[in-house]
Amino acid sequence: MTSQEPEVLFPASAPQVTTDLSNNVVLTTVNDLYNWAKMSSLWPLLYGTACCFIEFAAMLGSRFDFDRFGLLPRSSPRTADLIITAGTVTMKMAPALVKLYQQMAEPKYVIAMGACTISGGMFSSDSYTAVRGVDKLIPVDVYIPGCPPRPEAIMDAIVKLRKKIAAEDMRERGRLQQTHRYYTVKHNLKPVPEIITGKYLESETRQAPPPELAAAIGLPVPPALQTADFKQAEQQLKALRGGM
């Protein structure tokens, strides 16, 4: 029989295999990895409409180092997942803000910065154009009170948003999608049709000169100017000139 060395049941030193694994292998879950990637690479869409944005612009400088949180400002809502509303939101800008929010990809987050954005601020009592809180238009994740808030407050809001993202669960993504959450409070906002349609250059009067000018310089009158409306307007103009 060969002699066997006695086996030590509880060694004083750590096993070599376990040490190598702990130095080279990280154990995590897909959910934690997904949340870590989201909160470490937030791409904000800068939406500044008033004086609060000046404080936010100060945070972009080297003194406060906005990039330390992995935030990369974007100019297009389709590549952004965070929108920071800084300043007063008016009735005229509200449809544009909702459209920008709808164009952002899921998952998306909103930070309301300043008293005017949160509740209307000093315009909440007698203004007929200010929206009394941006949460009546889009869902808000973090509020930053102040008039205006300091850059340190913005940094604190970013930290709180990162903690909120870290606590999310991938299995609840379908339930947490920010849909059907508009107008949580009754509001008198009435969407209006777009003013700038790009078709103002296609009007008949811009496609060809007026009939009088065309006749004076010897140009043929286009068919568009020979309609009943133009003929009637021309007759009325002649009648007015005859009565003068």
Swiss-Prot record:
GO cellular component: plasma membrane-derived thylakoid membrane; respiratory chain complex I
Keyword Transport: yes
Cofactor: [4Fe-4S] cluster
PROSITE patterns: COMPLEX1_20K
Keywords: 4Fe-4S, Iron, Iron-sulfur, Membrane, Metal-binding, NAD, NADP, Plastoquinone, Quinone, Thylakoid, Translocase, Transport
Membrane topology type: Peripheral membrane protein
Textual note on the cofactor: Binds 1 [4Fe-4S] cluster.
Keyword Transcription: no
Biological process, per Gene Ontology: aerobic respiration; electron transport coupled proton transport; photosynthesis, light reaction
EC id: 7.1.1.-
Positions of [4Fe-4S] cluster binding: C51, C52, C116, C147
GO MF entries: 4 iron, 4 sulfur cluster binding; iron ion binding; NADH dehydrogenase (ubiquinone) activity; quinone binding
Reaction(s) catalysed by this chain's protein: a plastoquinone + NADH + (n+1) H(+)(in) = a plastoquinol + NAD(+) + n H(+)(out); a plastoquinone + NADPH + (n+1) H(+)(in) = a plastoquinol + NADP(+) + n H(+)(out)
Compartments reported by the entry: Cellular thylakoid membrane
Positions in coiled-coil regions: none
InterPro entries according to UniProt: NADH_UbQ_OxRdtase-like_20kDa (IPR006137), NADH_UQ_OxRdtase_20Kd_su (IPR006138)
Family from the record: Belongs to the complex I 20 kDa subunit family.
HAMAP family noted in UniProt: NDH1_NuoB
The protein's assembly and partners: NDH-1 can be composed of about 15 different subunits; different subcomplexes with different compositions have been identified which probably have different functions.
Cited function: NDH-1 shuttles electrons from an unknown electron donor, via FMN and iron-sulfur (Fe-S) centers, to quinones in the respiratory and/or the photosynthetic chain. The immediate electron acceptor for the enzyme in this species is believed to be plastoquinone. Couples the redox reaction to proton translocation, and thus conserves the redox energy in a proton gradient. Cyanobacterial NDH-1 also plays a role in inorganic carbon-concentration.
Database matches in PANTHER family: NADH DEHYDROGENASE (PTHR11995), NADH DEHYDROGENASE [UBIQUINONE] IRON-SULFUR PROTEIN 7, MITOCHONDRIAL (PTHR11995:SF14)
Protein name: NAD(P)H-quinone oxidoreductase subunit K
Organism, scientific name: Synechococcus sp. (strain JA-3-3Ab) (Cyanobacteria bacterium Yellowstone A-Prime)
